[in-house]
């Protein structure tokens, strides 16, 4: 296919146009008075969402060059979502603001590389200030506030997430399930999560979220490497195919040929199966597999116990209520083995007491926390499927934001932290930077006010006026868009996780700086 090549200003303007389209679609959702966006789906009902990264993933333009701009800014949103789980709309608005101002300066003759350096120095300054101002999360109130804001100002959801964290611990696992009623409820179940994901993306059942979801699966635990499918696995796969239930395989590893056979079975619809590598190494791996087998009422297929894969029967497999596997983690939600789990926990406690090694004690405590903490399951209730999807996205944001707040602390929300720091950045840049580097830093300084401007605009207020009002007040004072008043953000419960604020800025400036230093674009030429 022949290529189309654009240079200099033409290249940057085409990228900017694509960015503008995406930013406008995403920024209408910003703030408590942000609106929803309807997404048409190839299959099923349209989806109504208020989530920046979900909207960004759906936008694809006819013009190849503009679409490149969309893809670049989408990257800022996706990366922020991966790191912090929230703040995707803010990242998009910031990236767009930096690009727009940077374009003007580059067109006026500024050096793009020097501007990029200035942007990077300004970002480092702001990130250090966010860390300096961040308050650690010490009580349940702050958790409720963060979760409420991220779920679209839903205080009930905030309380539920705080309750879940209270019951499974700050490192605990919170899982989302579709409920059977119209109300959302919380349930604590036996379960555990470990940091290993699916071996092959062909196992994925939910392509939107890139995860494997299995209801009531069998689970095969083995510390062996699976190599010979015909002898080792086929007898078991045939038994499971008759039950029509899914299968989760947790093994040391699976050889390419064996993996190919399992994948083919999955793709042909013969068996809903997913394979995961076992966590840990050596003896620790065996112990973790034993923990999981006790949790699910199964047995570890190991030669030490005289078992081999070709003789496995269904009653030797574990059973779970639900399994969720992503590219990085596996969550097993089990039921009804309380007595055996309790005695296993007692056994681990005794090992902790008798162990001399600090490292070993740490690992044993980790195992105990995984096994005894359980999993908090939030059953999402809604009247329609469309509402259900929207609620799940909001709850996911709220859970991620809460965990981010626990990690790095909280700062005043609603865009006010960025506005206050922009004043300090202006003074610092004037004293420390010169020429085009100063221009780069001042671009970031002005861009920092854009999220608040947009929140005010979405609430029907004048963004520039609101920004000036906030600037002249103390750091904890900001704009409450739900009632249009200037308030103490901590007292009003309008707070953001510092990690979200930091990630949004870092990813936005990274993408924007790359766009500003672009001098040429090569894309496929559309055939007439």
UniProtKB/Swiss-Prot annotation:
InterPro entries recorded: Chaperonin_Cpn60_CS (IPR018370), Cpn60/GroEL (IPR001844), Cpn60/GroEL/TCP-1 (IPR002423), GroEL-like_apical_dom_sf (IPR027409), GROEL-like_equatorial_sf (IPR027413), TCP-1-like_intermed_sf (IPR027410)
EC id: 5.6.1.7
One of the record's GO molecular function terms: unfolded protein binding
Enzyme class: isomerase
Binding site for ATP: 29-32, 86-90, 414, 496
GO annotations of cellular component type: chloroplast
Coiled-coil segments on the chain, per record: none
Entry keyword ATP-binding: yes
Top-level division of the source organism's lineage: Eukaryota
UniProt keyword Nucleotide-binding, yes or no: yes
First-listed, main subcellular location of the protein, grouped into a coarse class: plastid
Keyword entries, A-Z: ATP-binding, Chaperone, Chloroplast, Isomerase, Nucleotide-binding, Plastid
Localization (cell): Plastid, Chloroplast
UniProt cross-references to Gene3D superfamilies, sorted A to Z: GroEL (3.50.7.10), GroEL-like equatorial domain (1.10.560.10), TCP-1-like chaperonin intermediate domain (3.30.260.10)
Annotated function: Together with its co-chaperonin GroES, plays an essential role in assisting protein folding. The GroEL-GroES system forms a nano-cage that allows encapsulation of the non-native substrate proteins and provides a physical environment optimized to promote and accelerate protein folding.
HAMAP family xref list: CH60 (MF_00600)
Family listed: Belongs to the chaperonin (HSP60) family.
Assembly behavior: Forms a cylinder of 14 subunits composed of two heptameric rings stacked back-to-back. Interacts with the co-chaperonin GroES.
Protein's recorded name: Chaperonin GroEL, chloroplastic
Organism name: Porphyra purpurea
């Amino acid at each position: 296919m022949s290529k189309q090549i654009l240079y200099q200003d033409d290249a940057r303007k085409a990228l900017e146009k694509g960015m503008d389209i995406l930013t406008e679609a995403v920024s209408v959702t910003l703030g408590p008075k942000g609106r929803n966006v309807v997404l048409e789906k190839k299959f099923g009902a349209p989806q109504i969402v208020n989530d920046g990264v979900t909207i960004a993933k759906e936008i694809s333009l006819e013009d190849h060059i503009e679409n490149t701009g969309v893809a670049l800014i989408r990257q800022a949103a996706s990366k922020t979502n991966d790191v912090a789980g929230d703040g995707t709309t803010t990242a998009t608005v910031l990236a767009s603001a930096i690009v727009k101002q940077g374009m003007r300066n580059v067109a006026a003759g500024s050096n793009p590389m020097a501007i990029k350096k200035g942007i990077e120095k300004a970002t480092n300054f702001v990130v250090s200030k966010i860390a300096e101002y961040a308050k650690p999360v010490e009580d349940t109130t702050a958790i409720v506030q963060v979760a409420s804001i991220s779920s679209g100002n839903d205080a009930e959801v905030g309380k539920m997430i705080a309750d879940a964290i209270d019951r499974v611990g700050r490192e605990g696992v919170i899982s989302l399930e579709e409920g059977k009623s119209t109300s959302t409820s919380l349930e604590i179940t036996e379960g555990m999560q470990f940091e290993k994901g699916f071996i092959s993306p062909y196992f994925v059942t939910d392509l939107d979220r890139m995860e494997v979801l299995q209801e009531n699966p069998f689970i095969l635990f083995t510390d062996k490497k699976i190599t010979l499918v015909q002898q080792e696995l086929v007898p078991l796969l045939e038994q499971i195919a008759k039950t029509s239930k899914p299968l989760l395989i947790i093994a040391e590893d699976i050889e390419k040929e064996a993996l190919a056979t399992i994948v083919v079975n999955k793709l042909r619809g013969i068996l809903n199966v997913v394979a995961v590598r076992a966590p840990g190494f050596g003896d620790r791996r065996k112990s973790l597999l034993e923990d999981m087998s006790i949790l699910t009422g199964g047995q570890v297929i190991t030669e030490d116990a005289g078992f081999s894969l070709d003789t496995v029967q269904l009653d030797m497999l574990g059973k779970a209520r639900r399994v969720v596997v992503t590219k990085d983690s596996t969550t097993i939600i089990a039921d009804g083995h309380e007595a055996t789990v309790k005695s296993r926990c007692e056994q681990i406690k005794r090992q902790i007491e008798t162990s001399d090694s600090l490292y070993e004690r740490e690992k044993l405590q980790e195992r105990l926390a995984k096994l005894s903490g359980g999993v908090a399951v939030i059953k999402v209730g809604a009247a329609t499927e469309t509402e259900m999807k929207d609620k799940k996205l909001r709850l996911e944001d709220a859970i991620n934001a809460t965990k981010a707040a626990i990690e790095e602390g909280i700062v005043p929300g609603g865009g006010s932290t960025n506005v206050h720091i922009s004043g300090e950045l202006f003074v610092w840049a004037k004293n420390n930077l010169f020429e085009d580097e100063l221009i780069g830093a001042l671009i970031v300084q002005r861009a920092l006010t854009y999220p608040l401007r947009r929140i005010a605009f979405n609430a029907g207020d004048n963004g520039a006026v609101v920004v000036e009002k906030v600037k002249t007040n103390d750091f904890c004072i900001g704009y409450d868009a739900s009632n249009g008043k200037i308030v103490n953000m901590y007292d009003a419960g309008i707070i953001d996780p510092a990690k979200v604020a930091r990630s949004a800025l870092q990813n936005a400036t990274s993408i924007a700086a790359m766009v500003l230093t672009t001098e040429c674009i090569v894309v496929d030429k559309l055939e007439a």
